[in-house]
């Protein structure tokens, strides 16, 4: 890292952008025209990605578009896809650091950018330039990177400008942030530059809309025109009318109100009747039932509906939002919701309580009386976009949508926005019909993409009256070469006072709502493919609204029915449509207390927070006086609770323009002149940037160098005295630990530098994080995690991190290069560790002292020493041994937690041990069977894997028993809360969230834990199964058999794909080394290494054991331990293709199971003893 002159960086960016625009021999590919702008693209010759160029013309001077771009706050107004734009810091008159956030037309998560922007005028060549480059800034975490890009404004005639925009985008930015890894979605980006093609046309439309001759007159006076004021109303307001209105306001308030009503009605409701008389007074407008009345109140336009039949319940104007907004405000607000759910749901207070196929359901407690619900997902529908669109918010909604029983268009405000009146059934009282007025927007993007967004017209404070408040939600319909992908983001708020939960548990309410939402999407998919079936339906088959009166009946239906994916209209286990007389008898029977309501909810994995997951958990600080501190715009305050106001981020969609856009003080906004002496009106200031590895730029820190380095007494009497501290520090970062220690002994100056914690941090990342995996989480690498961040939300592990892989990927067809990840160019910052439940944090736990270590100025030095100590003890086998005694039978399974150890034995007991005291905390008797499997104990451990039990389902772990029972054990209460039983004998289990594998004798079966149904089964003839394991690819299961083979079971095809032959004895155990390699242990006293891409023979055959190998455990592809009847062998897997035996630990009893992490090892023996080896003991 080194400081560079900021203007040198700007000059290099300027030269690169100028080359891309003016070099005419580049083989550009013409992508067509979009709104009179031509779009071209070319493959980036220097890296994977594309370069897009968009060209258009406008009849103005270059000065106008140059200054529109100069005001960064304006882009969120004129750019339809820009969610937020803000100036972070003005370096000088021509250079600034600005923040931008852009939504994705494909429904992906928003992308944040921090740009260093430079403005210049080349008046000799009649052109002006804006060049940008991505940088890092301390106020914006993890922005998206974009290569140098920019604009050219070329004056081709006295009042005509050609605008050229060139943007370099890499493949990572091109790829949409969706769960579906669709090649067609990426092709849309590559073939159209869909986000780039909107920018220039939007700029041209904005200038044409607001550019008037009155503004041209202001240019001659060198004043900033109102065009560049972000407080300017975006509508085409006639200045003369405004002046007349102001004069009328001074003369007669009544006349002023009448004029404002008429003028604003013309400006904001474009689809008004063409023969409407503009001179009608307010009384004539009030008497019209088909029109709304727009009044000016406190400088804000609000919609005042009339007390007519259509708007009889909207009689309070203070409860209405302003609908006079940009055509894509719904798209921008929905994009914020996507960012909340897809990027950081925990930090924004969301809890993922259920996953089902492509559906993910979230909730959060907004306040004590209301709850937010959200559903996110995407699906493929083999139908055209027009057909799919016709079933969403249309006359067919009441036949398809399980929420809606009526839909009517009240008013068409313009070509994009309309008001819809929706009638829907109540959840808690299904016979009741509620009504709501929604604001709906339909946007048509390039390539036929349709965006349909909606939200409630009323303010959230009316939730007490209606029971529901619809937040910005949307459907994205994305055409493909065949069919469409529909992306849905559904979010609303429910009024549920605490008294409701006493009658209907929250779990039941959320489950019913999730099933209703899923049924709606499935209906849209089904009838879009088979539209002729819809017209044959004479009545609603689902969910029998006419026969349901209470929520308990509705919950009972949803707990028993099964919605078929192929034909959702045919409901399995759906109750018949009984008459009202029979239903009334049942209700009286239940109300009398003879048979209390007992709802059987399927065993969906729910994860509720204990009060901490409310919307009030995320906070946004207000803007400060420092220009370097970035803070988001002020959020809309909660109407019911001031403590939760900061979470209402997406509910500020329709606030007034002044509140939303007044980000910076625009009185000091400079103005650039397109003239020969333009530089005389600006000021230049030098600035420095800190460049790191030539990739990203960082703003220089304001901290001064340590005082002791400035002392004249500390000198080396060498050339080092002439070098700046940053350069000396960089030189020292290239040394290893041995040379750093030697240099620290030469002089006091070098000693102080060698103690710099930044040097040891870089050395630590270089030495110990190069082989770490990034696919899962693991607690054991706590030293790689920044423990300084406190009070973090509880991490919701219902998010399936294994989905980072492609569902269609196969280990048999993957390339060999994918097995070894390349190290990052820059050491990533340490990720924050989530806060664990209080029940798992103890004062005597050794991990609690790590936070005190980090506060030390030599934190990374101490961490490096600790890591070296662990490696040294591991190589020598000198771990501190603690024996855990208490079991009376052989150990069948064991697992480590942050401060606990769990063990299961053949003595039919399950024990929990405290790591610090090595004492048994609790003993649970598992009936007449023994515990044989834990949750996650059949998975390979990686360096980033966090212990799953304490974070999953409120500290619930599943225990597999030999009699086939699955018991749910609560770590906090140390009791069995629930028991499932859908098989009667088992030798082992593999738990994978909803899927459960069980093997016994010669069969392996796959069950659905929610429905308790058998999904797949494979039977292997003439052998017995000893062990099963699943690696990175969840659709492949490795099976160790007594016939001396290892078989790979393809779960999708239910076939044995390959067989590994080579062992001369029964294969007893196996573990995965990486994605494609595994190690097996056999009764022939050998361990073998295999590569399933080349299964003909083993890679290595290692003979180091004196008896049959019974257990194997691998940690992070770095270390391995194997156990037989007499000893435990420790192996090093780093830096060599073949495992390297480090040491052998002799034991008095045969080993039954092993488990290791970075610092410790657990061994369970046949005599019931458990040994705990701590390699970090000094």
UniProtKB/Swiss-Prot annotation:
Pfam families: F-box-like (PF12937), START (PF01852), WD40 (PF00400)
Residue ranges occupied by any START domain in the UniProt entry: 1-208
WD repeat ranges, renumbered to this chain: 886-923, 925-979, 981-1017, 1020-1059, 1062-1100, 1104-1141, 1146-1178
Matches recorded under CDD domains: F-box_FBXL4, START
Keyword Repeat: yes
Pro residues composition-biased segments: 821-835
Ranges where the record places region Disordered: 223-296, 569-594, 618-649, 804-841
UniProt KW keywords: Repeat, Ubl conjugation pathway, WD repeat
A single MF term (Gene Ontology): lipid binding
KW Oxidoreductase (keyword) present: no
SUPFAM superfamilies for this protein: Bet v1-like, F-box domain, WD40 repeat-like
F-box domain ranges (all copies): 717-763
Biased composition (Low complexity): 229-293, 571-580, 809-820
Function: Substrate recognition component of a SCF (SKP1-CUL1-F-box protein) E3 ubiquitin-protein ligase complex which mediates the ubiquitination and subsequent proteasomal degradation of target proteins.
Protein name per Swiss-Prot or TrEMBL: F-box/WD repeat-containing protein A-like protein
Protein source organism: Dictyostelium discoideum (Social amoeba)
């Amino acid at each position: 890292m080194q400081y560079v002159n900021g203007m040198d960086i700007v000059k290099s960016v300027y030269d690169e952008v100028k080359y891309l625009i003016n070099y005419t021999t580049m083989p550009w590919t013409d992508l067509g025209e979009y709104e009179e702008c031509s779009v071209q693209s070319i493959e980036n010759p220097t890296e994977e990605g594309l370069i897009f160029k968009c060209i258009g013309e406008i009849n103005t001077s270059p000065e106008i578009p140059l200054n529109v771009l100069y005001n960064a706050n304006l882009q969120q107004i004129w750019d339809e896809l820009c969610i937020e734009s803000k100036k972070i810091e003005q370096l000088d008159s021509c250079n600034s650091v600005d923040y931008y956030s852009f939504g994705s037309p494909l429904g992906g998560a928003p992308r944040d950018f921090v740009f260093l922007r430079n403005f210049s005028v080349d008046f000799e060549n009649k052109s002006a330039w804006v060049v940008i480059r991505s940088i890092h800034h301390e106020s914006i975490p993890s922005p998206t990177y974009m290569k140098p890009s920019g604009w050219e404004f070329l004056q081709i005639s006295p009042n005509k400008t050609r605008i050229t925009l060139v943007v370099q985008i890499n493949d990572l930015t091109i790829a949409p942030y969706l769960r579906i890894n669709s090649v067609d979605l990426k092709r849309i980006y590559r073939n159209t530059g869909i986000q780039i093609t909107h920018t220039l046309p939007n700029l041209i439309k904005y200038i044409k809309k607001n550019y008037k001759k009155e503004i041209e007159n202001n240019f001659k006076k060198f004043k900033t025109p109102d065009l560049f004021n972000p407080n300017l109303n975006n509508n085409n307001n006639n200045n003369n009318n405004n002046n007349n209105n102001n004069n009328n306001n001074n003369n007669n308030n009544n006349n002023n109100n009448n004029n404002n009503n008429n003028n604003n009605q013309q400006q904001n409701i474009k689809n008004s009747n063409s023969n409407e008389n503009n001179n009608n007074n307010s009384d004539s407008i009030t008497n019209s039932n088909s029109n709304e009345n727009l009044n000016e109140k406190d400088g804000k336009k609000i919609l005042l509906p009339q007390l007519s039949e259509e708007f009889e319940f909207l009689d309070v104007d203070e409860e209405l939002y302003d609908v006079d907004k940009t055509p894509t405000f719904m798209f921008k607000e929905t994009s914020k919701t996507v960012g909340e759910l897809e990027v950081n749901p925990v930090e924004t207070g969301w809890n993922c309580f259920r996953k089902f196929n492509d559906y993910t359901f979230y909730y959060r407690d907004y306040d004590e009386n209301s709850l937010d619900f959200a559903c996110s997902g995407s699906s493929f529908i083999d139908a055209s976009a027009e057909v799919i669109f016709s079933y969403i918010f249309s006359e067919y909604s009441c036949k398809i949508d399980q929420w809606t029983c009526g839909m009517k268009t009240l008013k068409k405000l313009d070509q994009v926005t309309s008001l819809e009146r929706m009638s829907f059934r109540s959840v808690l009282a299904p016979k009741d019909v509620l009504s709501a007025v929604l604001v709906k927007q339909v946007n048509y993007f390039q390539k036929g993409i349709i965006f349909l967004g909606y939200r409630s017209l009323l303010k959230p404070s009316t939730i007490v009256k209606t029971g529901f408040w619809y937040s910005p939600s949307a459907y994205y319909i994305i055409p493909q070469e065949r069919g469409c992908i529909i992306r849905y983001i559904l979010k609303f708020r429910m009024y549920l006072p605490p008294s409701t939960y006493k009658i209907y548990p929250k779990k039941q309410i959320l489950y019913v709502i999730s099933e209703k939402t899923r049924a709606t999407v499935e209906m849209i998919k089904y009838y879009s493919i088979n539209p002729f079936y819809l017209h044959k339906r004479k009545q609603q088959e689902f969910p029998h609204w006419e026969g349901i009166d209470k929520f308990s009946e509705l919950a009972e239906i949803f707990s028993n029915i099964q919605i078929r994916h192929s034909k959702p209209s045919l409901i399995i286990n759906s109750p018949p449509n009984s008459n009202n007389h029979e239903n009334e008898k049942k209700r009286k029977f239940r109300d009398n207390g003879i048979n209390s309501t007992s709802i059987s909810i399927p065993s969906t994995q729910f994860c509720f927070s204990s009060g901490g997951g409310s919307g009030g958990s995320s906070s946004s600080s207000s803007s400060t006086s420092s220009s370097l501190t970035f803070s988001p715009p002020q959020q809309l305050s909660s109407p019911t609770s001031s403590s939760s106001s900061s979470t209402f981020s997406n509910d500020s969609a329709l606030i007034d323009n002044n509140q939303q856009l007044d980000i910076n003080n625009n009185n000091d906004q400079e103005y650039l002149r397109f003239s020969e002496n333009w530089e005389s009106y600006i000021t230049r200031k030098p600035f420095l940037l800190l460049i790191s590895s030539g990739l990203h730029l960082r703003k220089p820190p304001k901290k001064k160098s340590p005082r002791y380095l400035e002392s004249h007494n500390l000198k080396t009497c060498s050339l080092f005295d002439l070098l700046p501290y940053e350069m000396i520090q960089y030189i020292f970062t290239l040394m290893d630990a041995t040379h750093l220690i030697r240099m620290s002994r030469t002089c006091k100056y070098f000693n102080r530098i060698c103690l710099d914690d930044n040097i040891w941090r870089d050395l630590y990342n270089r030495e110990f994080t190069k082989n770490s995996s990034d696919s899962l989480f693991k607690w054991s690498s706590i030293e790689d995690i920044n423990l300084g961040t406190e009070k973090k939300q509880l991490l919701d592990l219902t998010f399936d991190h294994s989905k980072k892989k492609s569902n269609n990927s196969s280990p048999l067809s993957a390339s060999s290069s994918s097995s070894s990840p390349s190290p990052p160019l820059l050491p990533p910052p340490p990720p924050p560790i989530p806060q664990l439940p209080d029940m798992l944090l103890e004062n005597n736990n050794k991990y609690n002292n790590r936070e005190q270590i980090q506060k030390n100025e030599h934190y990374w030095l101490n961490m490096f020493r600790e890591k070296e100590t662990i490696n040294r003890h591991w190589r020598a086998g000198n771990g501190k041994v603690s024996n855990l005694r208490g079991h009376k039978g052989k150990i069948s399974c064991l697992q480590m937690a942050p401060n606990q150890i769990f063990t299961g034995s053949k003595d039919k007991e399950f024990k929990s041990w405290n790591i610090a005291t090595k004492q048994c905390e609790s003993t649970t008797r598992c009936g007449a069977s023994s515990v044989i499997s834990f949750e996650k104990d059949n998975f390979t451990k990686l360096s980033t894997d966090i212990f799953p039990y304490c974070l999953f389902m409120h500290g619930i772990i599943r225990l597999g028993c030999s009699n086939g029972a699955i018991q749910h054990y609560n770590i906090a209460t140390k009791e069995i809360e629930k028991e499932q039983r859908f098989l009667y004998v088992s030798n082992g289990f593999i738990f994978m969230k909803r899927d459960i594998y069980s093997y016994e004798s010669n069969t392996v079966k796959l069950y659905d834990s929610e429905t308790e149904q058998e999904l797949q089964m494979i039977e292997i003839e003439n052998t017995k199964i000893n062990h099963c394991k699943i690696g990175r690819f969840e659709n492949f299961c490795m099976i160790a058999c007594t016939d001396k083979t290892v078989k790979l079971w393809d779960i999708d095809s239910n076939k044995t794909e390959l067989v590994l032959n080579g062992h001369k004895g029964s294969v007893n155990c196996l573990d995965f080394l990486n994605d494609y390699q595994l190690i097996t242990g056999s009764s022939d006293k050998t361990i073998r290494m295999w590569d399933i891409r080349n299964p003909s023979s083993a890679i290595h055959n290692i003979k180091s054991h004196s008896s049959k190998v019974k257990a194997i455990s691998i940690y992070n592809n770095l270390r391995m331990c194997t156990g037989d009847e007499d000893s435990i062998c420790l192996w090093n897997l780093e830096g060599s293709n073949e495992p390297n035996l480090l040491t052998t630990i002799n034991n008095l009893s045969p080993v039954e199971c092993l488990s290791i992490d970075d610092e410790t090892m657990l061994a369970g023996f046949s005599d019931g003893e458990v040994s705990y080896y701590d390699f970090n003991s000094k």
